[in-house]
Amino acid sequence: MDKIKQLFANNYSWAQRMKEENSTYFKELADHQTPHYLWIGCSDSRVPAEKLTNLEPGELFVHRNVANQVIHTDFNCLSVVQYAVDVLKIEHIIICGHTNCGGIHAAMADKDLGLINNWLLHIRDIWFKHGHLLGKLSPEKRADMLTKINVAEQVYNLGRTSIVKSAWERGQKLSLHGWVYDVNDGFLVDQGVMATSRETLEISYRNAIARLSILDEENILKKDHLENT
């Protein structure tokens, strides 16, 4: 069986199994969706949002792009956010990065990759902005640190969109969260950047960057100690 036909075979088996487990499953799903969460994640095939959160279809609204970015000129992402906030009345938006992210590594390599370079420029801007946290780290730790910083920056970007600010101003319950998924062990890690208002956004963002600064200093001290022993 060729690869495309295999997908249809997989779909048939799945649909049959779901109907056997619950005869009204697809009818209920067709009637409405009631997700409580919007997931903004990376396009990487190793980070399947529904699977790693153990949620079913209809429970998680998902948008994915390279390196889980929220860019103020990206109308694709912003349209998803607006629909989630204004129509679905989602209460939680999660921005999730992940370890060993190809987008992060590509941005760090700074090679000519064609069209995608325009997208990666946003990651490179973050790198230059926080270069003091990245310069002395090993390449592997530098990528992990940039992944964490990127998550904090994207949560901050999201909180500054007119969509989210308007929701908060009218008293709508809406929380923003920044997480990192570790592809090495399958666990999600809360990065401690969380906001429920414009005020908490500023505080949470500053605190998250400050914590990463402390972590950076500890990593440098460990590296210096190992090199001198």
From Swiss-Prot:
A Pfam family that the UniProt record links to this protein: Pro_CA
Keyword Metal-binding: yes
CDD domains the UniProt entry points to: beta_CA_cladeA
GO terms for biological process, alphabetical: carbon utilization
Principal EC category: lyase
UniProt-recorded Gene Ontology molecular function terms: carbonate dehydratase activity; zinc ion binding
Reaction catalysed by this enzyme: hydrogencarbonate + H(+) = CO2 + H2O
Keywords: Lyase, Metal-binding, Zinc
Cofactor annotation comment: Binds 1 zinc ion per subunit.
Keyword Transport: no
Database matches in SUPFAM superfamilies: beta-carbonic anhydrase, cab (SSF53056)
Domain of life: Bacteria
Positions that bind Zn(2+): C42, D44, H98, C101
EC numbers on record: 4.2.1.1
Cofactors named for this entry: Zn(2+)
PROSITE patterns: PROK_CO2_ANHYDRASE_1, PROK_CO2_ANHYDRASE_2
InterPro entries per UniProt: Carbonic_anhydrase, Carbonic_anhydrase_CS, Carbonic_anhydrase_sf
Family per record: Belongs to the beta-class carbonic anhydrase family.
PANTHER family, alphabetized: CARBONIC ANHYDRASE
NCBIfam families assigned to the protein according to its UniProt record, in alphabetical order: PRK10437.1
UniProt name for this protein: Carbonic anhydrase 2
Protein's gene: can
